[in-house]
């Protein structure tokens, strides 16, 4: 019954804020268009549609606010005005009672809170839709007393989330069935992505593991501090981490008064991000100002402090290769190659004309080359490409959308700190090394070495599969045959590249020696 009433409330809010015009007006059935006109009688719909959608999500509560935040990153699906407005959604939720937080801690560790902590501050210092944070002190196994931050999951969140997700999935199914435009927006896919995102955030141990990985990765950089996790005090509903003392990065006057080099801070932020993306393929994907502080402690003065590791982006080797080749093609203004990469990735529907896709990409990218490099926003280039992709129904991978969103955040933060920030100058060393690592001879040798055992096992099967294929039994073996042919093609390409590269290197050495001898004589 509660689910029924919740569904009625959601429909009422949607009608109240005029969200029916986003859906009902695209229905093909005439009677549904009549319904759209009827329900819009007597309402003031002067506000832009993006603003009305944002206000409706805020009215529906924190889970829908979270959904809007995730939806704002899908610029490959949403019109720009709606995506821009959803980016303003803020996760503001009143704290839950400290007695409930203490009960959660005692249930997680099966002992009184006084036995878990030396001291526990009952007043929360931060609160969001998923969890809230308290300060405390603990005694380690070595007898050392440490100041910590305790993150406690909001009670009954799982039940609330499951109910709202079920309603979202049901409504997404309706939209896909009744609206052609709605089906193109892939509502069920978006809700499924949100489902995974929320369940990841509900497991606080996962967040602790993300923080531990980032801390290891960033240890040698000495530009950013990641809190240490105390694993003996971590549970899916409670995690305990090192307390970080810093100044919020938005408080620029305090930072300047303390003597922090603000332009260097801007460059360091870009360096941190590109290191995480290009070197590690594991990046903090929620780097808005609320999650960033700056240390004023003498031994770590001016370093970033990262907080909240619930959203992490990862890039596979395939993702890196795709990005590397796109960057090369982009700077060569080879838009046909960019279009081919989209087709080769399998993200473009069959039948897409490559010349049309190439023309659309050229329209997006070409205007940027008339600007100084420091004025080019890589995040905006990616965003425009994703928006163009909507016309061709390109399936942009979630991790690349997350990368684009984070890159926009970093660029915005960097230029807020230093309007003269030259993003490309700061990023150039990382890009150059990354290109060498991704498409240089060392990478080719690594690929050949890694894949040689697999090819050695598969290639002897090729004659048999080819014979079976020619004997009119393609259904059973077509997939395996194509896989082997592709493997053989990759192997040949690697070998040719290595051989030609080696020959070129030797010829280059001989030419240099010849030139030296000519000069000597």
Swiss-Prot record:
Regions that span the bilayer: 496-516
Short name of one Pfam family: ABC1
Annotated active site: 286 (proton acceptor)
A single BP term in Gene Ontology: regulation of ubiquinone biosynthetic process
Positions bound to ATP: 125-133, 151
EC number: 2.7.-.-
Name this protein carries in UniProt: Probable protein kinase UbiB
Species whose genome carries this gene: Variovorax paradoxus (strain S110)
GN (gene name): ubiB
């Amino acid at each position: 019954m509660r689910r029924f009433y919740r569904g009625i409330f959601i429909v009422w809010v949607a009608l109240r804020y005029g969200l029916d015009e986003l859906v009902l007006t695209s229905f093909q059935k005439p009677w549904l268009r009549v319904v759209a006109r009827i329900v819009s009688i007597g309402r003031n719909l002067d506000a832009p549609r993006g603003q009305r959608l944002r206000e409706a999500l805020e009215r529906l509560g924190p889970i829908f606010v979270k959904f809007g935040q995730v939806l704002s990153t899908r610029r490959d699906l949403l019109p720009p005005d709606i995506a821009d407005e959803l980016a303003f959604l803020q996760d503001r939720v009143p704290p839950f009672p400290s007695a409930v937080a203490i009960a959660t801690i005692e249930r997680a560790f099966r002992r009184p809170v006084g036995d878990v902590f030396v001291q526990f501050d009952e007043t929360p210092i931060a609160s969001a839709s998923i969890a809230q944070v308290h300060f405390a002190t603990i005694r380690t196994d070595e007898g050392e007393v440490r100041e910590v931050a305790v993150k406690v999951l909001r009670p009954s969140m799982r039940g609330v989330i499951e109910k709202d997700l079920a309603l979202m999935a049901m409504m997404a199914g309706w939209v896909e069935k009744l609206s052609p435009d709605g089906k193109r927006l892939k509502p069920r896919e978006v809700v499924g992505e949100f489902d995974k995102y929320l369940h990841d955030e509900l497991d606080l141990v996962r967040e602790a593991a993300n923080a531990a990985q980032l801390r290891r990765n960033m240890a040698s950089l000495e530009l950013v501090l990641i809190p240490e996790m105390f694993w003996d005090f971590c549970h899916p509903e409670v995690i305990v981490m090192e307390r970080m003392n810093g100044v919020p990065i938005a408080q620029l006057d305090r930072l300047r008064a303390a003597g922090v080099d603000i332009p260097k801070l801007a460059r360091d932020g870009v360096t941190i991000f590109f290191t995480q993306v290009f070197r590690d393929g594991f990046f903090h994907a929620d780097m808005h100002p609320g999650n960033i502080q700056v240390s004023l402690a003498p031994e770590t003065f001016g370093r970033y402090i990262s907080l909240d590791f619930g959203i992490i982006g990862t890039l596979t080797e395939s993702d890196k290769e795709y990005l590397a080749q796109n960057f090369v093609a982009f700077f060569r203004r080879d838009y046909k190659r960019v279009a081919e990469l989209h087709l080769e990735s399998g993200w473009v529907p069959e039948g897409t004309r490559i010349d049309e896709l190439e023309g659309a990409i050229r329209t997006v990218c070409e205007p940027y080359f008339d600007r100084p490099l420091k004025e080019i926003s890589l995040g905006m280039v990616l965003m425009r490409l994703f928006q163009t992709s909507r016309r061709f129904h390109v399936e942009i991978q979630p991790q690349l959308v997350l990368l684009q969103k984070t890159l926009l955040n970093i660029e915005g933060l960097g230029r807020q700190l230093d309007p003269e920030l030259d993003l490309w100058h700061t990023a150039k060393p990382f890009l150059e090394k990354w290109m060498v690592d991704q498409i240089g001879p060392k990478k080719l040798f690594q690929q050949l070495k890694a894949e040689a055992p697999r090819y050695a096992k598969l290639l002897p099967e090729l004659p048999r599969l080819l014979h079976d294929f020619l004997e009119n039994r393609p259904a059973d073996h077509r997939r395996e045959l194509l896989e082997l042919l592709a493997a053989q093609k990759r192997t040949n390409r690697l070998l040719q590249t290595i051989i030609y590269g080696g020959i070129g290197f030797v010829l280059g050495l001989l030419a240099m020696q010849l030139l030296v001898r000519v000069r000597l004589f």
